[in-house]
Amino acid sequence: MMYRVKEIFKSIQGEGFFSGKEAVFLRFTGCNLWNGRKKDRSKSICNFCDTNFVGTDGKNGGSYNLAKLISVIKNVWNHTYTSEDKFIVLTGGEPLLQVDDLLVEKLKKENFFIAVETNGTIKTDLKFDWVTVSPKENAEWNLRKGDELKVVYPQYKFDLKKIINLDFKYFFLQPKDEEKNRTNILKTINYCKSHKPWFPSFQIHKSLGIS
């Protein structure tokens, strides 16, 4: 199998439970909720995405076989971090369109803690160490358990009071990044203040001016 990768880069996790943690990000090309073209955004299922996942032209992007992909990932980690606490985030786009058991198995052999960020449309039995599900209100929601649930807010079709009964350890609301960003931040904070166990998640990497 060849994996189509937008980019592989070093950074800190900027949102959710692992905010501030050093990581290698493996961003896969492609998504099943938007094709990534601006002209098609308004009619897509996820029309507020803030990520460029089109093509393979990002840093360390390309089409890789398994061995080469692992080599690039190890190189990015080893030239950046000295810690043996290896942490990788599989993201997209929608990573579960491409991630398979061979990739997961090989990353585990290299002692990576594997986190995946998915929109929840695809069920999976792959043995990740951490699963973050970020559902979209107009999409099918099939993966309804994991470690961390992250809802971009506001999405008014979700019943946030019922969602907390699902099988997740942590529940985050993340302000929708749009022209009403300040308003969304205040809405998020105010909701979380009075509705446990919801907790606000902010994209600190954007505040710091990093990827």
Where on the chain are the PLM-derived regions?
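Generic preference for well-ordered secondary structure
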Residues: 10-15, 19, 87, 91, ...
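Conserved Radical SAM active-site core
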Residues: 3-10, 36-128
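Flexible, acidic/Gly-rich N-terminal and inter-domain linker regions that tether
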Residues: 1-52, 199, 208-210
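Conserved AdoMet/S-adenosylmethionine-binding subsite of the radical SAM
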Residues: 84-87, 96-211
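Conserved beta-strand segments that form the floor/walls of ligand-binding pockets within enzyme
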Residues: 4, 25-27, 89, 132, ...
